[in-house]
């Protein structure tokens, strides 16, 4: 029985070490594969610290330096200057909707 358990354990170790996940392919514009934070840099979270503390970094596709994801963690990487202009455009639309609502139009 002991011999069977040892053989099973060794087989499990060999299986686990040979079936590790392959490297992700990051082929979208301004994106690269690296080991990084648990939080993606997004336009909505620029300048904020990631609230998740990792023991080890995460292997994933991240935006290159100077870029952030537009939308959620899977959005396209856009330049940080585009984040600010898109935020301004959205804020302006919301303000105009609020003004038209207040004026009864």
UniProtKB/Swiss-Prot annotation:
Main location: secreted
Keyword Magnesium set for record: no
Signal peptide interval: 1-21
Organism: Bombus ignitus (Bumblebee)
Function: Inhibits metalloprotease (human MMP3), trypsin, chymotrypsin, plasmin and microbial serine protease (proteinase K). Exhibits antifibrinolytic activity by binding plasmin and inhibiting it. Does not inhibit elastase, thrombin or microbial serine protease (subtilisin A).
Cystines in this chain: 26-61, 35-57, 39-50, 43-83, 63-77
Keyword Signal: yes
Cellular localization per UniProt: Secreted
Name of the protein described by the UniProt record: Venom metalloprotease inhibitor
Similarity annotation: Belongs to the serine protease inhibitor-like (TIL domain-containing) family.
Keywords annotated in UniProt: Disulfide bond, Hemostasis impairing toxin, Metalloenzyme inhibitor, Metalloprotease inhibitor, Protease inhibitor, Secreted, Serine protease inhibitor, Signal, Toxin
Domain TIL residue range list: 26-83
Known tissue expression: Expressed by the venom gland.
């Amino acid at each position: 029985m002991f011999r069977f358990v040892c053989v099973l354990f060794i087989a499990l170790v060999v299986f686990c070490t040979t079936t590790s996940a392959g490297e992700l392919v990051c082929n979208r514009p301004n994106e690269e594969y690296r080991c990084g934070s648990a939080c993606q840099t997004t336009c909505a979270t620029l300048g904020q610290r990631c609230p998740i503390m990792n023991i080890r970094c995460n292997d994933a596709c991240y935006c290159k330096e100077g870029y952030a994801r537009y939308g959620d963690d899977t959005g396209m990487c856009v330049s940080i200057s585009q984040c600010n202009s898109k935020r301004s455009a959205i804020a302006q639309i919301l303000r105009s909707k609020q003004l038209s609502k207040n004026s009864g139009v």
